């Protein structure tokens, strides 16, 4: 790992005046840890592997230096000629993230007077409009792998002049099954290029990818930088009582907003209907919704018009809500990595957040796997009025133990599970 002295200001990172002016307008007061460590290396042309919590400011981490290098190319006349070429390619796993990243880049570039062209391409919308947007090429292309391959096969864009490749949320792209698409795209890129890889987790697939693609990269690992800002809690419930417990928590806590995760599209609709019968209005967000409807729901949630959103994992990435109070796992995610992606929607950028998982006895084994893979241990708790019925297998109700004991710790006494009065924020630090 690389040890870097953290600059105090964006000016010390070597950013140019138009970018500094825009950051001041956006009230970015100082670089986040990932920005402070990565931006100088990116400006120097180094390959980069970065692991950081969601909400750590990683979009600006790669967007700002890419914009600065493009501006320098324009000023010196080194910008690529006209044609269906792209200079900076950013690959992302979902259409929502593609749109969000492109919007952020355009926002950072407002003082460049339209000199830098940014285009986002993704599935679920007309390919013809995207082909039209790519006429004459583009400086920055933010794309999902599948749609990009479609556009390449239509000769709408070429990748042989790409200078920088950004793999944003690489673990998510691989977990969604984009391995073949990524391999096909990599084969079309020039050998000489800068590669920036960002990933919240580093499973074996991602490690292999970094070994194959990157050249002597700078490595930055900051996943644990703001762990203390996110409180994780686990509540045991009886089978069939999750909806009642969820409604109780929503009504009692009166959260400003809540993001609830389920594992299937039809579960979204079903849970929304059951909550509606209990007087709680919830919007749903999943892959069967058209792009315009999904955009409407996301915009409504971001502006606060929608208080409760029920979503599948398609929303676990690319959803950036300021000060989201709570994320609730109504169903446990299928993979330990997806657990981290889900809960990363709350407690972002130093804000205090809360992640709640509701588990019945059928979930216990899977949650232990999630804990083991993510090297966490969470106490099982119960909510007053919804105590768990006694079951024959006491080991199921036993809280999972740490995977390894510290030396000399000896045997640990098993603690009784708490029964609480749903004081969900117990243990959280005060927040404005």
Give a label for each model feature.
Residues 377-432:
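Non-catalytic, charged low-complexity extensions flanking SF2 helicase motor domains
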Residues 2-394:
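Conserved helicase RecA-like core
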């Amino acid at each position: 790992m690389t040890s870097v002295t953290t600059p105090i200001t964006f000016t010390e990172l070597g950013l140019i005046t138009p970018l500094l002016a825009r950051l001041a307008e956006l009230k970015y007061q100082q670089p986040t840890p990932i920005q402070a460590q990565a931006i100088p290396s990116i400006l120097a042309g180094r390959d980069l592997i970065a692991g950081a919590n969601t909400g750590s400011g990683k979009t600006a981490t790669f967007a700002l230096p890419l914009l600065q290098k493009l501006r320098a190319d324009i000023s010196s006349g080194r910008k690529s000629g006209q044609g269906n070429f792209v200079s900076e390619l950013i690959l992302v796993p979902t259409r929502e993230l593609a749109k969000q990243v492109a919007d952020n880049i355009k926002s950072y570039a407002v003082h460049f007077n339209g000199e830098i062209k940014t285009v986002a391409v993704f599935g679920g919308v007309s390919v013809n409009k995207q082909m039209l947007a790519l006429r004459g090429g583009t400086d920055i292309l933010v794309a999902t792998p599948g749609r990009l391959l479609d556009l390449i096969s239509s000769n709408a864009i070429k990748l042989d002049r790409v200078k920088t490749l950004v793999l944003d949320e690489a673990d998510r792209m691989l977990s969604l099954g984009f391995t073949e698409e990524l391999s096909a795209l990599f084969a079309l890129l020039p050998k000489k290029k800068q590669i920036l890889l960002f990933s919240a987790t580093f499973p074996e697939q991602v490690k292999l990818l970094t070994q194959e693609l990157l050249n002597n990269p700078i490595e930055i690992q900051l996943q644990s930088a703001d762990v203390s800002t996110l409180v994780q809690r686990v509540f045991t419930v009886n089978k069939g009582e999750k909806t009642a417990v969820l409604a109780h928590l929503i009504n009692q806590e009166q959260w400003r907003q809540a993001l609830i995760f389920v594992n299937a599209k039809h579960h979204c609709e079903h849970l929304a209907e059951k909550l509606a019968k209990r007087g709680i209005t919830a919007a749903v967000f999943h892959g069967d919704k058209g792009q315009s409807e999904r955009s409407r729901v996301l915009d409504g949630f971001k502006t606060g018009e929608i208080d409760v959103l029920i979503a599948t994992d398609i929303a676990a990435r690319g959803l950036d809500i300021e000060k989201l109070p709570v994320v609730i796992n109504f169903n446990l995610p299928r993979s330990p990595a997806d657990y981290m992606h889900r809960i990363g929607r709350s407690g972002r950028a130093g804000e205090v957040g809360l992640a709640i998982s509701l588990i019945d006895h059928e979930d216990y084994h899977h949650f232990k796997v999630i804990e083991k893979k993510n090297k966490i241990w969470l106490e099982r708790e119960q909510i007053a009025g919804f105590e768990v019925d006694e079951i024959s297998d006491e080991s199921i109700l036993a809280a999972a133990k740490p995977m390894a004991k510290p030396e000399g710790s000896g045997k640990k006494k098993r603690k009784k599970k708490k029964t609480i009065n749903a004081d969900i924020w117990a243990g959280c630090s005060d927040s404005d």
